[in-house]
A protein has these predicted regions:
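Disordered, low-complexity tails and leader-like regions
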Residues: 2, 17, 88-92
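Absolute protein N-terminus
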Residues: 1-2, 98
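Short amphipathic alpha-helical segments
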Residues: 15-41, 72-76
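N-terminal acidic leader/helix
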Residues: 6-11, 24-26, 32, 89-91
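Non-catalytic surface loops within mature trypsin-like serine protease
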Residues: 11-13, 58-60, 94-96
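Short, well-ordered beta-strand segments in beta-rich or mixed alpha/beta enzyme
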Residues: 3-9, 39-71
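Glycine-rich beta-strand-turn "strand-cap" elements at beta-sheet edges
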Residues: 37-53, 76-98
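Generic alpha-helical secondary structure signal
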Residues: 14-18, 62-65
């Protein structure tokens, strides 16, 4: 059973959100070069461009730990961005892509 984690981040301004998106893109590209398995989608609210939502899908608890460890080692996001975060996590019980 896979696990889904949705994080809604609201930044102080659009520039902080854009910086977060750019850093996330770089982390994703590096993960692909290293053949590290990550599965996420990132969306930006078109009417509130300072709001970014990340949707992560993990295989299991072990995979969550591996991804979080990878991200902590490769994370260069400055603390000054400090968005407000709302997180939703749950087991996937139905997935139309499976």
């Amino acid at each position: 059973m896979s696990i889904m984690r949705i994080t809604v981040r609201t930044f102080q301004n659009e520039q902080h959100a854009e910086m977060f998106v750019a850093i996330s893109q770089k982390i994703y590209e590096d993960a692909m070069k290293n053949n590290f398995k990550i599965n996420f989608t990132m969306i930006q609210n078109p009417s509130l461009k300072n709001q970014v939502t990340s949707i992560w899908k993990y295989d299991n608890e072990k995979h969550i730990k591996e991804v979080r460890s990878y991200l902590s080692k490769h994370n260069s996001i400055p603390n000054s961005l400090s968005p407000k975060e709302v997180v939703f996590t749950g087991d996937v019980i139905l997935d139309s892509n499976s």
